[in-house]
Amino acid sequence: MDNTSVQGTYADNFAIRCTEPVLTTNPATNAKYYIYNNYINGYYNGITTKLTFQSTITDNEVHMRPDNTNVWPAHFHSGIFIEATNDNLVTKNLVDMPSSNPLQWWHYGIFTAGSTTPKIKCNSTNYVGVGIIANGLNNTT
């Protein structure tokens, strides 16, 4: 997927977006996605999953588009973003920016928030403000 002629803004420009359209009462019934072997170039945000169960994100290359707006509030971007998910696997992915830039402090390689037992291993990040961040995890095992 190539987005060299950017479409959208930092808030709505995603290469792949996987979500559960209806909030379920049992997280085990949330959708499962297998996102693998994708080449993503020029998007502000690469892959996002929300309200999923046992999704797998593996062997992807995400080359993010920099947003050098240095104003508050900052424009947060993620190569891979996982939110409110259960038992996901994120492995063997490459997330990067084209070059180093001090204005890219709000760009995250892999970001997970509000998730239960995420498994994040063997990934590579380069030229992003934060490589891997885990926030508000709910590990019940």
PLM-predicted stretches and their roles:
Residues M1, Y10, N30-N37, S55-N60, ...:
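All-beta strand scaffolds that present successive hydrophobic residues in beta-strands
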Residues Q7-N30, N41-K50, D59-T85, M97-A113, ...:
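Extracellular beta-strand/beta-solenoid scaffold signature
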